[in-house]
Amino acid sequence: MLRFLGYLFIFSLWLLQSMEIFAASKDKNPILIICSYNPAAHQTSVTISDYMEEYNKLGGKRDIIIENMNCKSFSESPLWSDMMTQILSKYKGENHPAQIVLLGQEAWAAYLSQRDSMQVKVPVICSLVSSNVVILPKDTMEHLDSWMPESVDIFDDHLNIPELKSGFINRYNIEDNIRMIQAFYPKTEHIAFISDNTYGGVTMQALMRKEMEKFPDLDLILMDGRRHTIYTIVEELRNLPENTVIMVGTWRVDMNEGYFMRNATYAMMEATPAIPTFTPSSVSLGYWAIGGVLPDYRKVGGEMAMESIWIIRRITG
């Protein structure tokens, strides 16, 4: 069943029907949550907390194990597949999980990159991810900072992931953001796209490049955090050509792997006070970006727990 909430996709592979979900299964295999980031990080912490609270309310009895990949910058990306393999290798045989919950883009991408090698595939839920992905490189690359991967959409490109039973997936609408820019600023000739040195930044840039092919009259200027510090990107922003509009994708980590919060986008804003700015992701919205077509961001931990129990009940009877 496919349910649409704005651009947030929640999907399941079985028709929803009334059922008792409060009885605990006799099978005590755990639920394994694999996080991209430290579980203490705010969004991850809130999602896990809401999940566990609702899971307990619904009568869930299985142990919940949390593993952390502790992903940082995109320069580490060739290591993530092996990290996922090592985590999953701890839960084999009688200890295999009843269900895997993947939280975050990096955990999701790492799972996709090595799922074909898994001998036993258990039901999977993904959350805090987007529909557009790039397939992780299998080996260390010399020029990872200039790698231009293809954007793949798990819906449009029909990826075959039968064990994926449910997901809370954001879909970024770059095309409508560009059309909004053209409607407000019809003289636009260039779009400067800002992305950072994270997996999320690389995937969003790949999507941006793909969608810009629909607009051959527009020039795309990439402001890539894999090759910029906050200081060099501010200097580049000061030298943008006329009739440019800025689109802010994401900014957390620069080429030196320094972490920045809102102060970085404030510095960018101060460098470009007269250039219109939009965002497809809500980054800088309200103080720099004047608008954007956004996913329907909201808390989903409680709904994830409902899906978990429903899926396990469906499988175990």
Model-based region annotation:
Residues 21-317:
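Short hydrophobic alpha-helices and adjacent helix-cap/hinge residues
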Residues 1-8:
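Bacterial N-terminal signal peptides that target proteins for export
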